[in-house]
């Protein structure tokens, strides 16, 4: 046994490589052991330091893989499982346990998170050389019983099936202990690099090999000052020093100091010594000069995105200045990998910097996992429509085109069907021939056939089930689709998809191993497959050696690269505080360690935090050979953050914090580097003139199109492919002639008028192009309205001999039996429930009709307008016709005055501001149409809300009070003529603001005609502006801006071309209500008409 240590600015790998070469010269075969996270880097470094750059006698490997290189006499007869297989075994054993048998974990026994934690605990106990029976020492009785039962069942199952989950080190330990290793130990040597602690399993291997006479060399970083100090607690080198002291004591071998004498102390050595003296409370006088501050820079940035851009620019600049540099000379360290992963790809692709993030990716969100999840959901939830749509959307099932999938989805949404029997029936329903039923039935059979065959599978042996699954993948064209999808991808992405497919096949292999000979149902198989895929991870290797490596900062080793950029070093990320998320608490781990024999140790993360983090900081400061950049953003994940205390210490020593910002207001040589990045800088620079005070979050193409469009506009040029703002063209004359022939009547409805004043282009889409909403066969708001209208129409037409309640019930019964409504509301339990709710609404609304003796209903669903009577006359002599339907016409019994009623599903009131702006013309239009048909005597026009009133019981003192308050909301809302208001009862909301004189009534009708005239002239001229209205001058309401994907209108960029609603000109702070508000708007109407 030989123990070495060196100062952190001397390459430990170089020293240990020399030791390895000496051992080779002595005839030894050397295993150069490195930690898992550093093995690839160590291999490259060792090859560089070897005098011949190669050696057949030196193998750079990891502890776990060393067993492969030693010849074992008896290979284990058992089949080895990996984590996926072990997870499946846990899933199977837990599924067989009754929830009542588990006191703590019964309710979550098949939860993926619990299974993951059980796997981790299984591995931890194996590495710590601890037996599962040691769990008997747990003090929590319920947890002890559960864990012992679970591990006992899993262990019995693995032994029964000749399955092994032991690590390779366990096999090696067993082989060495039983003399089953045929390799000559005298010809073997170990060189161990990069460790500051061994697991119990690793230490056991070292102990056994040392006992067999194997020469072992172990090296670590430590200063002589730290190693010889009698007190190491809190020291930066505490982790490595304690490690060396433990080994020196155990093997009675003092550690040798191999530190080299450096001619000049570099900046990083200086920072290391200052940090060390700070933590061991010794005094050290060292001056930090400008060169040191240049070599070790501390950046303060605003955002993570800015950090990455600054790093990318810096790399590009250095490559531009020094042609000898390449990407492999740079290393990027991340404070939090997940937070930077997406932005990293976007920005580095923009700057054309190849990078490799050595991180495993989870398969949980891959389309292949979603494919399995959709099939499981189809089986488990009996063929829901949404699950079938999700399956088709993965683009992995069947070779149907996107247009076929869209047509099929549209049709099954129209039908609203669920359940396999419904899908097995031939499609026969169509909406006026809109759907191609013949084609849809061909698609239905193509989609259902493989699924029907698969779902017909009963519980059977795993081997047979896998055969059926293989047939399903072939018939469903899954493998073909995956292959076709990957052929169009880049080479790197093709490799990624290949790794995904390997992981998928591996899950199936592990399933076959674990369940060999077992009876498995299809649903259990799909659940296990989905569970295995959710636990699976895959990773790719870099396509080239010359790439910028990106990794988490806590995996760094000293002297890794020439230039190192460590970003995201906030207080939350540096230091990283390891949290215990396992099934055993720190206290339970401590108790188990004390109760078991020496050498059997579970790791307690919290006890390792301090010494591990200080050593990590030391490695971080010394990670660069030439220049190191440490950065912390002020905003991390959109919340304020502080820089790490370690960075503040460096600043205290004399290193300077540099405020770094991206400056788009000027261009400099730093913007040079790559074509894409330069173009991006130019775009950002030109953006400043129009949007300097707003934070942009647009794609590169959008920004570029806006800037180029602006430049073209300045030159008097136009490119319709890149407009500066959304605009529409006036329709051509021949188009207008085809749409609105001079000899043909032009009709404009009140709903069309409202749509026009909401957004002119929306009118064009709906009423000119005929854009329709998605069809639904199931009952919707329209069918609910028709149902209620029909009930009231029938109830009011029945003879008055019976009471109103009897007539209403008769109307409900007869309407419910109509074929149209019977088909809709008897289709499903959900539809029947909806019908009951609607009937409650009908009975509640009937309360107003039942107790209203002052009026009588003379017409229901009355049509108005038509060819006989023009609504308005345009200046060019062309007539505009309005036609529509009034829900109900009432007449006052006292004097025969007419009133118009419109049913609404929610509370609707007449509002003068909306009427003035063309958004509330329904009631005036009804009155004007009836007046043109000869009616002269009116009492008003109103809305009736058809809904059950909701009253908060907290706002009233008694139930009787609730009834009174609820009845207040059940009133007719609208416009009433002042002279007739005395005849109207309590069911009419006839306050002063809603009452009109004859002159005011006529004024409203005149202005309403004016609104129709303005709209008709624009429509007939073919001018449809993209101008959704804004009520507050800051945003557009969602129901106004329904066609954003078509128009491209974005409120935060194009608000200037929105229509700002006209408002009253009031003095600051003045507010009008009631009668005064009405009079102010009427005066504004007079002014508008007199212009």
From Swiss-Prot:
Q: State the needed cofactors, names only.
A: Mg(2+)
Q: Name one GO biological process term.
A: double-strand break repair via homologous recombination
Assembly and oligomerization:
Heterodimer of RexA (AddA) and RexB.
This protein's UniProt keywords? ATP-binding, DNA damage, DNA repair, DNA-binding, Exonuclease, Helicase, Hydrolase, Nuclease, Nucleotide-binding
InterPro entries cross-referenced by the UniProt entry: ADDB_N, DNA_helicase_suRexB, P-loop_NTPase, PDDEXK_AddAB-type, Restrct_endonuc-II-like
What the record says about disrupting the gene is: Cells lacking this gene grow poorly, are more sensitive to UV light than wild-type cells and have reduced double-strand exonuclease activity.
Describe the function of this protein: Involved in DNA double-strand break repair. Is not involved in recombination during natural competence or in plasmid establishment. The heterodimer acts as both an ATP-dependent DNA helicase and an ATP-dependent, dual-direction single-stranded exonuclease. Recognizes the chi site generating a DNA molecule suitable for the initiation of homologous recombination. This subunit has 5' -> 3' nuclease activity but not helicase activity.
Any remaining note in the record? Despite having helicase-like domains, this subunit does not have helicase activity.
Instruction: Give the EC number.
Output: 3.1.-.-
Protein's UniProt name: Exonuclease/helicase subunit RexB
This chain's source organism reads: Streptococcus pneumoniae serotype 4 (strain ATCC BAA-334 / TIGR4)
Main enzyme class: hydrolase
Q: Taxonomically, which superkingdom?
A: Bacteria
Q: Which family does it belong to?
A: Belongs to the helicase family. AddB/RexB type 2 subfamily.
Gene Ontology molecular function: any one = helicase activity
């Amino acid at each position: 046994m030989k123990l070495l240590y060196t100062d952190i600015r001397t390459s430990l790998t170089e020293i240990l490589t020399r030791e390895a070469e000496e051992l080779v010269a002595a005839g030894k075969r050397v295993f150069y052991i490195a930690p898992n996270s550093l093995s690839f880097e160590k291999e490259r470094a060792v090859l560089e330091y070897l005098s011949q750059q190669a050696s057949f006698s030196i193998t750079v490997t990891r502890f776990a893989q060393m067993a492969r290189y030693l010849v074992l006499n008896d290979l284990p007869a058992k089949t080895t499982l990996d984590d996926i297989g072990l997870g499946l075994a846990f899933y199977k054993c837990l599924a067989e346990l009754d929830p009542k048998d588990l006191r703590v974990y019964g309710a979550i026994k098949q939860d993926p998170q619990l299974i993951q934690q059980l796997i981790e605990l299984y591995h931890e106990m194996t590495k710590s050389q601890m037996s599962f029976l040691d769990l008997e020492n747990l003090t929590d009785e319920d947890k002890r019983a559960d864990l012992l039962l679970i591990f006992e069942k899993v262990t019995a199952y693995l032994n029964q099936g000749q399955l092994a989950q032991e690590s390779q080190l366990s096999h090696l330990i067993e082989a060495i202990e039983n003399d089953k290793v045929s390799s000559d130990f005298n010809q073997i040597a170990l060189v161990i690099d990069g460790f500051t602690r061994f697991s119990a399993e690793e230490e056991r291997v070292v102990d056994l090999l040392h006992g067999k006479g194997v020469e072992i060399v172990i090296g670590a970083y430590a200063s002589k000052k730290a190693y010889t100090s009698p007190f190491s607690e809190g020291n930066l080198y505490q982790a490595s020093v304690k490690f060396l002291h433990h080994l020196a004591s155990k093997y009675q071998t003092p550690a040798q100091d191999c530190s080299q004498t450096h001619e000049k102390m570099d900046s990083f050595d200086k920072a290391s010594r200052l940090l060390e003296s700070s933590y061991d409370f010794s005094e050290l006088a060292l001056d930090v000069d400008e060169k040191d501050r240049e070599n070790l820079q501390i950046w303060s940035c605003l955002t993570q995105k800015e950090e990455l851009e600054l790093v990318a620019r810096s790399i590009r600049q250095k490559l531009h200045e020094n042609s000898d540099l390449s990407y492999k000379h740079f290393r990027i360290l991340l404070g939090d990998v997940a937070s930077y992963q997406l932005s990293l790809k976007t920005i580095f692709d923009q700057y054309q910097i190849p990078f490799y993030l050595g991180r495993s990716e989870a398969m949980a969100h891959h389309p292949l996992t979603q494919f399995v999840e959709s099939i499981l959901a189809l089986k488990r939830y009996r063929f829901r429509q949404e699950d079938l749509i999700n399956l088709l959307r993965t683009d992995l099932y069947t070779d149907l085109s996107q247009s076929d999938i869209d047509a099929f989805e549209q049709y099954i949404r129209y039908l609203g069907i669920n359940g396999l029997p419904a899908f097995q029936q031939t499609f026969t329903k169509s909406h006026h021939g809109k759907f191609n039923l013949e084609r849809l039935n061909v698609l239905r059979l193509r989609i259902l056939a493989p699924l029907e065959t698969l779902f017909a599978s009963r519980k059977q042996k795993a081997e047979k089930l896998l055969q059926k699954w293989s047939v399903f993948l072939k018939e469903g064209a899954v493998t073909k689709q995956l292959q076709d999808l990957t052929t169009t991808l880049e080479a790197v992405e093709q490799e990624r998809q290949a790794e995904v497919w390997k992981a998928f096949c591996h899950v199936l292999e592990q399933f076959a191993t674990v369940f060999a000979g077992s009876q498995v149902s299809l649903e259990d198989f799909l659940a296990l497959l989905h569970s295995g895929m959710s636990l699976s991870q895959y990773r790719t290797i870099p396509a080239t050696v010359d790439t910028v490596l990106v990794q988490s900062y806590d995996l760094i080793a000293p002297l890794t690269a020439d230039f190192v950029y460590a970003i995201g070093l906030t207080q939350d990320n540096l230091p990283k505080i390891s949290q215990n998320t396992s099934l055993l608490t720190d206290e339970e781990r401590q108790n188990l360690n004390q109760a078991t024999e020496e050498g059997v140790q579970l790791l307690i993360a919290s006890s390792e935090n301090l010494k591990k983090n200080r050593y990590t900081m030391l490695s971080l400061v010394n990670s660069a050979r030439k220049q190191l950049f440490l950065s912390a953003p002020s905003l991390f994940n959109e919340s304020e953050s502080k820089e790490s205390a370690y960075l503040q210490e460096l600043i205290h020593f004399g290193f300077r914090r540099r405020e770094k910002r991206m400056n788009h207001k000027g261009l400099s040589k730093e913007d040079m580097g790559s074509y894409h990045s330069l173009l991006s800088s130019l775009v950002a620079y030109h953006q400043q003139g129009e949007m300097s005070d707003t934070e942009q979050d647009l794609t590169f193409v959008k920004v570029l199109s806006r800037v180029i469009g602006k430049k073209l506009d300045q030159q008097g040029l136009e490119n319709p492919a890149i407009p500066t703002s959304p605009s529409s063209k006036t329709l051509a004359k021949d188009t207008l002639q085809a749409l609105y022939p001079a000899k043909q009547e032009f009709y404009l409805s009140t709903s069309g008028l409202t749509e026009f004043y909401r957004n002119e282009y929306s009118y064009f889409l709906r009423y000119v192009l005929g854009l329709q909403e998605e069809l639904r066969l199931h009952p919707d708001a329209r069918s609910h309205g028709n149902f209620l209208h029909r009930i009231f129409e029938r109830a009011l037409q029945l003879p008055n001999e019976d009471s109103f309640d009897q007539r209403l019930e008769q109307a409900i019964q007869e309407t419910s039996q109509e074929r149209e409504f019977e088909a809709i509301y008897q289709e499903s339990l959900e539809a029947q429930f909806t019908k009951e709710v609607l009937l409650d609404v009908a009975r509640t609304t009937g309360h107003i009709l039942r107790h209203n003796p002052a009026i009588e209903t003379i017409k229901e669903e009355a049509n108005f307008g038509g060819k006989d009577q023009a609504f308005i006359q345009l200046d060019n002599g062309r007539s505009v016709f309005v036609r529509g339907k009034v829900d109900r016409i009432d007449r006052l019994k006292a004097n025969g005055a007419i009133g118009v009623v419109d049913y609404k599903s929610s509370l609707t009131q007449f509002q003068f501001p909306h009427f003035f702006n063309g958004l509330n013309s329904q009631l005036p239009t009804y009155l004007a149409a009836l007046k043109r048909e000869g009616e002269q005597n009116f009492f008003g026009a109103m809305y009736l809300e058809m809904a059950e009133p909701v009253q908060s019981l907290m706002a009233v003192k008694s139930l009787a009070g609730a009834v009174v308050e609820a009845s207040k909301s059940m009133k007719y809302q609208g416009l009433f003529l002042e002279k007739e208001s005395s005849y109207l009862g309590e069911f009419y909301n006839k306050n002063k603001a809603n009452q009109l004189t004859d002159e005011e009534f006529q004024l409203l009708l005149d202005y309403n005609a004016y609104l129709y005239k303005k709209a008709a002239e624009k429509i007939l001229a073919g001018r449809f502006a993209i101008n959704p209205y804004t009520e507050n001058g800051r945003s557009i309401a969602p129901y106004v801006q329904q066609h954003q994907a078509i128009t491209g209108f974005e409120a935060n960029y194009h608000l200037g071309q929105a229509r700002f609603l006209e408002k009253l000109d009031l003095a600051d702070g003045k507010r009008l209500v009631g009668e005064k508000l009405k009079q102010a708007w009427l005066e504004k109407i007079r002014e508008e008409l007199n212009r």
